[in-house]
C-alpha cells in the first residue's frame, strides 16, 4: 500500500492578468488565486482495508475557501471549484478588501466556521472512529501580501498571494488483521476479539461475523475493514499499551480466553517508536500464536510485523510485555 493521506498543498499564487495603463484601478476589492499543487497524487485505499484502489486526500469539490480579515474573522466563503480554474489554479475576484488571510478546509459535514480559529478547532476535533474519507483536513495562509494587480472586466484589482498547506491533523492507527494459529486443540474458533486501552483507556469490542473454520484463517473486523482509530498526535503515545483478548467459541479446556499485551512498537529498522505524527497512519497485523502465549495467559513475548502507512506510509513492529510486574 502506498501513501494514505498525503497533505494537499494549496498555493495562493499569481494570476496571469494584463496590467494596462488605461484601465481603472480599484483598491476596495481584491483578487486571490489558489493552486492545488498535488491534487492528482494518489494516496491510499478509500476504505479502511488493504485494497489497492487509491484516492486523494481531498478532492477539489471537498474544499471550502475561507477568506478572513486580519483578526481571523471569516468575511466570505466560497467553494474552491467556484473559482476560475486554469490548469489547476482557482482564481477568486472581487473579494472584500478586508481579506488578509485564507483558510482551506474540507468540512466533512461541519458548518462553515465564523473564524479561522474555529476552523482549526474543527480540524483538531477528535473523531476516533471516522474513516479516512471523513477526516477533516485544513490549512491556513497566515497574513498575505500584495504581489501584483489583476485585470477583471476592465478593472485592475490588487492581487494577493500566500501559501496554504492542507493536511490532516490526526495520527491514525489501523489493526488490519488478526491471525489465529494453533490456539489450543489445533483449532481455536472464536467469536469475539476485545481491544482495551487504545481509545483513551476505554474498551472496544468486536463481534466477528465469521468464526474461524481453520487454524490458519484470518479475521478482520466487519466486512474486510480494519479496526481503526484517529488520535490527536499528542495523545497517541498514551495509547501505546494495548491489550487484545480473543474469546473462544465452544472452547472446552481450562483457559477460555487468550490475551496479547502490546507495550511498544518498532519501525522497519527495529528502532522503538516513541511518538506518533500527524498525517501518518500506523498499520498493524497481529498474530495470535499458541507458542507466543504464556501458560498463565498473563503475558506473551512476540514481535509483530507492522506496516506504517502515510497519509505517509511507515512500517512498525509491536513488542509485547512479558514481565507481569510492569
Say what each PLM segment does:
Residues 21-45, 166-180:
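A short, Gly/Thr-enriched small/hydrophobic beta-strand-prone motif that recurs across taxa
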Amino acid at each position: 500500500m502506498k501513501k494514505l493521506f498525503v497533505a494537499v498543498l494549496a498555493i495562493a499564487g499569481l494570476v496571469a492578468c494584463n496590467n494596462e495603463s488605461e484601465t481603472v484601478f480599484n483598491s476596495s476589492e481584491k483578487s486571490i488565486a489558489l493552486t492545488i499543487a498535488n491534487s492528482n497524487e494518489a494516496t491510499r485505499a478509500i476504505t479502511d482495508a488493504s485494497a489497492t484502489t487509491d484516492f486523494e486526500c481531498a478532492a477539489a469539490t471537498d474544499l471550502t475557501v475561507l477568506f478572513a480579515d486580519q483578526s481571523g474573522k471569516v468575511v466570505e466563503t466560497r467553494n474552491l471549484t467556484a473559482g476560475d480554474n486554469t490548469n489547476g489554479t482557482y482564481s477568486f475576484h472581487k473579494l472584500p478588501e478586508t481579506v488578509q488571510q485564507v483558510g482551506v478546509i474540507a468540512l466533512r459535514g461541519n458548518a462553515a466556521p465564523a473564524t479561522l480559529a474555529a476552523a482549526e478547532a474543527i480540524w483538531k476535533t477528535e473523531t476516533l472512529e471516522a474513516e479516512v474519507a471523513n477526516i477533516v483536513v485544513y490549512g491556513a495562509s497566515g497574513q498575505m501580501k500584495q504581489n501584483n494587480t489583476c485585470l477583471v472586466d476592465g478593472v485592475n484589482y490588487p492581487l494577493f498571494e500566500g501559501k496554504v498547506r492542507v493536511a490532516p491533523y490526526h495520527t491514525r492507527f489501523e489493526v488490519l488483521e488478526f491471525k489465529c494459529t494453533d490456539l489450543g486443540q489445533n483449532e481455536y474458533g472464536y467469536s469475539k476479539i476485545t481491544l482495551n486501552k487504545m481509545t483513551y483507556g476505554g474498551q472496544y469490542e468486536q463481534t466477528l461475523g465469521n468464526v474461524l473454520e481453520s487454524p490458519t484463517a484470518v479475521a478482520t473486523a466487519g466486512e474486510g475493514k480494519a479496526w481503526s482509530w484517529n488520535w490527536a498526535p499528542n495523545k497517541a503515545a498514551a495509547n501505546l499499551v494495548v491489550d487484545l483478548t480473543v474469546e473462544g467459541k465452544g472452547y472446552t479446556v481450562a483457559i477460555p480466553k487468550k490475551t496479547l499485551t502490546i507495550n511498544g512498537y518498532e519501525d522497519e529498522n527495529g528502532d522503538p517508536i516513541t511518538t506518533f505524527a500527524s498525517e501518518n497512519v500506523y498499520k498493524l497485523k497481529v498474530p495470535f500464536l499458541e507458542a507466543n502465549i504464556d501458560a498463565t495467559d498473563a503475558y506473551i513475548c512476540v514481535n509483530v510485523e507492522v506496516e506504517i502507512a502515510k497519509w505517509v506510509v511507515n512500517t512498525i513492529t509491536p513488542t509485547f510485555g512479558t514481565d507481569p510486574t510492569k
